[in-house]
Amino acid sequence: MMDMKENDQKRNDMMDMKSHDERKNLNSSQGKNEITFPKVLDPKKDNNGYKSYTLKAQKGKTEFYKGNFSNTLGYNGNLLGPTLKLKKGDKVKIKLVNNLDENTTFHWHGLEIDGKVDGGPSQVIKPGKEKTIKFEVKQEAATLWYHPHPSPNTAKQVYNGLSGLLYIEDDKKNNYPSNYGKNDLPIIIQDKTFVSKKLNYTKTKDEDGTQGDTVLVNGKVDPKLTTKEGKIRLRLLNGSNARDLNLKLSNNQSFEYIASEGGHLEKTKKLKEINLAPSARKEIVIDLSKMKEDKVNLVDNDETVILPIINKEKSTNKDTTPKVDKKIKLEGMDDNVTINGKKFDPNRIDFTQKVNRKETWEIENVKDKMSGMKHPFHIHGTQFKVLSVDGKKPSEDMRGKKDVISLEPGQKAKIEVVFKNTGTYMFHCHILEHEDNGMMGQIKVTK
């Protein structure tokens, strides 16, 4: 029978296990930095029909944050590595060069090849040394990757940047997007922690799996993706050391799941969420043309933004309004309120307009140092049409003829204004106290 000390120890051990299973908080991407895509490494063809490549593991410097350079590792560059594109039946020769200060290997994750060239811990390449491997590609289309596998330094070397993608390309015609870097997009997701805005694996290492608080996509912090494409194919790689990812779209839109680690599914599936374990790959196709919005977020666990996706085609095509004829700036709070920097003067005419002339007015609720407040803007003697709000088509409840539009601080609207009668008319904020405090102007409509 266990004594109390043994029970306490067992309880403590269980608590330790529980704490190690908990996910470290991951901060959302702020969408500040446009992601780029790894270059495709072009092969040389030798006389024996081999596609010939050279990969160098090397040290580098990477500016994750402006003015702050981190010591990183990369293949043929400062961080990450180029994409290799192969096809079933290809004969491949790769010269592997170790320009690091420590042992490394080159492991071909998911590639079905002879164990002698798999790149496991027993196939070490020492600092300053190189070796050449050969193999034939015998498997179907898939998204694979390569990374170091030296014992006991795999985690450190991957965390510091040694990762790259290897495609076995589609060998049959399908309708999947296939233009690399345009609509066929490699997406390497990783999480890291920065100490004083610099990468430092030693200070953040966790023996039960190092998880970071900062998301990176293709080596960019605060990543975003801007595209004009209607459909995009994301080749997702969870390149994190330890973090599981549960990915979905923030608008709850479904996507087409087309491939797993081993290649294309026999039958694609419509899903709204997928799980990516560390090292896993999955391919999905997102139809951005079905979105009402011009932006959607790829999120983890319903909340953490991994990658904001901006549909440039939607956002650039929405504001097709004509040139602006008049500008109205609503400013202030309390009794310090103005239109175009002026308080109402009954002896002043602020604007003129011809009767039956169609004009475009731009109404802006200026956001000041105090943040401002919502202002409902009203025009006497006419009903106007809302053309756009912040450059986008107005919401359904703003359709139809209107004589008042309410704008939040910082919002800007364009409206179409036609007067059918002549005379002098007021325009003003319809918070009545603001109107009384001078947030009002006059327009004279003439023949």
Swiss-Prot record:
Protein's name in the database: Multicopper oxidase mco
Organism in which the protein naturally occurs: Staphylococcus aureus
Subcellular location: Cytoplasm
Key word Transmembrane helix present: no
Spans annotated as Disordered: 1-43
Keyword Cell membrane appears in the UniProt entry: no
Residues binding Cu cation 2, per UniProt: H109, H147, H430
Induction: Induced by copper.
Segments of skewed composition (Basic and acidic residues): 1-25
Cofactor(s) needed: Cu cation
UniProt KW keywords: Copper, Cytoplasm, Metal-binding, Oxidoreductase
EC number(s) given by UniProt: 1.-.-.-
Binding site for Cu cation 4: H375, C429, H434, M439
Family: Belongs to the multicopper oxidase family.
Details of cofactor binding: Binds 4 Cu cations per monomer.
Enzyme class per UniProt: oxidoreductase
InterPro entries: Cu-oxidase-like_N, Cu-oxidase_C, Cu-oxidase_fam, Cu_oxidase_CS, Cu_oxidase_Cu_BS, Cupredoxin
GO cellular component, one term: cytoplasm
Residues involved in Cu cation 1 binding: H107, H378
Gene Ontology molecular function, alphabetical: copper ion binding; oxidoreductase activity
UniProt function note: May be involved in copper homeostasis and oxidative stress response. Oxidizes the substrate 3,3'-dimethoxybenzidine in vitro. Also possesses low levels of phenoloxidase and ferroxidase activities.
Binding-site residues for Cu cation 3, renumbered to this chain: H149, H380, H428
